[in-house]
C-alpha cells in the first residue's frame, strides 16, 4: 500500500508532559489530543493507546515514550508522554531530550511532589528550554487560596532550577473532566464547556509562550539511533529524532560510534507512517539504509554527514551530582568511580579518572549535591561533541548530569 504524504503546512514543535506519577500526565495528553481533534474534526489518540506499554501495565507503571500528534490553529505538535516513574528516568532522558518545551503537570490537590522536583531538574539538565504549568484536578480543590498556594510553591521550585518562575504561564483545570466531556461529544467546540475551554487555554499558553524553535536545519545532519528493525524486501530502518540538519533520499551518511565507522546511502524516509522526500531537524523519523544488516547497527550509534563527527572515549565535563533527595547517591565517590554514561540514546560504562571542585580547587571526594569538573574515559568509543549533555547513572538510577566541556581523545 502506498503511504500518504506528510504535509508540512504549519511550524512543527516537539513538546511533552512531565511531572509526578499519578498527577495526570497521560490523561492530559489524551485530553489535549481529543480536544484539538474535536475542534479540528480529526481523529484523536485514546488514553489507552497513549499509555500502551503492555509489558509494564501489570505493575501499573507507564514506561515507553508515547508519541502523539495534534494541531492548534498555529502549529503542528508532536507530543511525548514521558514516563512518570523514577525507575524510568532513563526513558525520560531520551524522551525529555526530544522537547522544545514541556507541560509540567502538578496536581492542585497534592501540590509539588518529589518527582515534580526531579523532572524540573531533569528538564533543566537535558536542555528543555521552556515550561508551561498545568495545575490539574482543580475540581478537587474548593479553596481558591489553596490553588494560589500550590502555584506559588511550583513557581518557587522552578526559580530554584533557573527557570523564569515568575513569567511562566499557569493554567488550572481538570484533564479528566475535559476528556470525559470530549468523549461524550467528539465535535465539541470552544465555548461549549468550561473544562474543555481550560484545555484550549493551556494550548493558547503553549502556542504563545513556547517559542517556535530555531531549528538546527542549517547545521550538518545528525541523528542518534533509537531503534532498528528490518522490513522484509526493503532493508534496515533506523529510527530516531533528527538532532540537526536536513537529510534527503540518496544522501550518503556515516554510521558512527561503538564500532568502526561505516558509510551507507539513504534509500527511504518515513514519518508518522508517511513517506518524505527529506527529513529535517526535529523530525521523528525512520531512515531506510542501503546494504546495512540489522546486526550492523544498534541504539546509541549516530547517523551523520560524513566527516562531521568522530567517536571518542575521553573527555572533560562540567557535572552536577544529584542529592539523595533528588534520587541520587547517599554516599560520596572517589576517582576511579565507574558508572554508566548515558549519552543521547545509550548507556556506556566509563571511569571518572579525576575531578576538581567547580571553582577549580582540589577535591578528594565528590559528595551528593556537588558540582564538579571531571575527566572521564569510556570503555567504548561513541560520537561525542563539546556542549553535548549526558547523564551519569548507576544501577538504573540517575546520579548526575553533565555537559562535555572538552574532548581529550
From Swiss-Prot:
- The region called G3 is annotated at 81-84
Determine the domain of life of the protein's source: Eukaryota
List the residue ranges of the region (G2).
Answer: 60-64
Q: Where is the region G1?
A: 19-26
The EC number(s) this enzyme carries:
3.6.5.3
Q: What is the name of this protein?
A: Elongation factor Tu, chloroplastic
Please give the SUPFAM superfamilies that the UniProt record associates with this protein. EF-Tu/eEF-1alpha/eIF2-gamma C-terminal domain, P-loop containing nucleoside triphosphate hydrolases, Translation proteins
| Purpose | GTP hydrolase that promotes the GTP-dependent binding of aminoacyl-tRNA to the A-site of ribosomes during protein biosynthesis.
Annotated region G5: the residues are: 174-176
Localized where?
A: Plastid, Chloroplast
- Catalytically driven reaction(s): GTP + H2O = GDP + phosphate + H(+)
Question: Which terms in the GO cellular component ontology are assigned?
Answer: chloroplast; cytosol
Q: Which gene does this sequence derive from?
A: tufA
For this chain, one GO molecular function annotation is: GTPase activity
Q: Where does Mg(2+) bind?
A: 26
InterPro entries per the record?
A: EF-Tu_GTP-bd, EF-Tu_GTPase, EFTu-like_2, EFTU_2, G_TR_CS, P-loop_NTPase, Small_GTP-bd, T_Tr_GTP-bd_dom
Keyword annotations for this protein, in alphabetical order, are:
Chloroplast, Elongation factor, GTP-binding, Hydrolase, Magnesium, Metal-binding, Nucleotide-binding, Plastid, Protein biosynthesis
- Domain (tr-type G): give its ranges: 10-214
Q: Please give the residue ranges the record annotates as the region G4.
A: 136-139
Instruction: Give the enzyme's main class according to its UniProt record, as a single word.
Output: hydrolase
Amino acid at each position: 500500500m502506498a503511504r500518504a504524504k506528510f504535509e508540512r503546512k504549519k511550524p512543527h514543535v516537539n513538546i511533552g508532559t512531565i511531572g509526578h506519577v499519578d498527577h495526570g500526565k497521560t490523561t492530559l495528553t489524551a485530553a489535549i489530543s481529543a480536544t484539538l481533534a474535536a475542534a479540528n474534526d480529526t481523529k484523536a489518540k485514546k488514553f489507552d493507546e497513549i499509555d500502551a506499554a503492555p509489558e509494564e501495565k501489570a505493575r501499573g507503571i507507564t514506561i515507553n515514550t508515547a508519541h502523539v500528534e495534534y494541531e492548534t490553529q498555529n502549529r503542528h505538535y508532536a507530543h511525548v508522554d514521558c514516563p512518570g516513574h523514577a525507575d524510568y528516568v532513563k526513558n525520560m532522558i531520551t524522551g525529555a531530550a526530544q522537547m522544545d518545551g514541556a507541560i509540567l503537570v502538578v496536581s492542585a490537590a497534592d501540590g509539588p511532589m518529589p518527582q515534580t522536583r526531579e523532572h524540573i531538574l531533569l528538564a533543566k539538565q537535558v536542555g528543555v528550554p521552556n515550561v508551561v504549568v498545568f495545575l490539574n484536578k482543580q475540581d478537587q480543590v474548593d479553596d481558591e487560596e489553596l490553588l494560589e498556594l500550590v502555584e506559588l510553591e511550583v513557581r518557587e521550585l522552578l526559580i530554584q532550577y533557573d527557570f523564569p518562575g515568575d513569567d511562566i504561564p499557569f493554567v488550572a483545570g481538570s484533564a479528566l473532566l475535559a476528556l470525559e466531556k470530549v468523549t461524550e461529544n467528539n465535535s465539541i467546540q470552544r465555548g461549549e464547556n468550561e473544562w474543555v475551554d481550560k484545555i484550549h487555554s493551556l494550548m493558547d499558553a503553549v502556542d504563545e509562550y513556547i517559542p517556535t524553535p530555531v531549528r538546527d536545519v542549517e547545521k550538518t545532519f545528525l541523528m542518534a539511533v533509537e531503534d532498528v528493525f528490518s522490513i522484509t524486501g526493503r532493508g534496515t530502518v533506523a529510527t530516531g529524532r533528527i538532532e540537526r540538519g536536513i537529510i534527503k533520499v540518496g544522501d550518503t551518511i556515516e554510521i558512527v560510534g561503538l564500532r568502526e565507522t561505516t558509510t551507507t546511502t539513504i534509500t527511504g524516509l518515513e514519518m508518522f507512517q508517511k513517506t518524505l522526500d527529506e527529513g529535517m531537524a526535529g523530525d521523528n523519523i525512520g531512515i531506510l539504509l542501503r546494504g546495512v544488516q540489522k546486526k550492523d547497527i544498534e541504539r546509541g550509534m549516530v547517523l551523520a554527514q560524513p566527516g562531521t563527527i568522530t567517536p571518542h572515549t575521553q573527555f572533560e565535563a562540567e557535572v552536577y551530582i544529584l542529592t539523595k533527595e533528588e534520587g541520587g547517591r547517599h554516599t560520596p565517590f572517589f576517582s576511579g568511580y565507574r558508572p554508566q554514561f548515558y549519552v543521547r540514546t545509550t548507556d556506556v560504562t566509563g571511569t571518572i579518572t579525576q575531578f576538581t571542585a567547580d571553582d577549580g580547587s582540589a577535591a578528594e571526594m565528590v559528595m551528593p549535591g556537588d558540582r564538579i569538573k571531571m575527566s572521564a574515559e569510556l570503555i567504548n568509543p561513541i560520537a561525542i561533541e563539546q556542549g553535548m549533555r549526558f547523564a551519569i547513572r548507576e544501577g538504573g538510577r540517575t546520579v548526575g548530569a553533565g555537559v562535555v566541556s572538552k574532548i581529550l581523545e
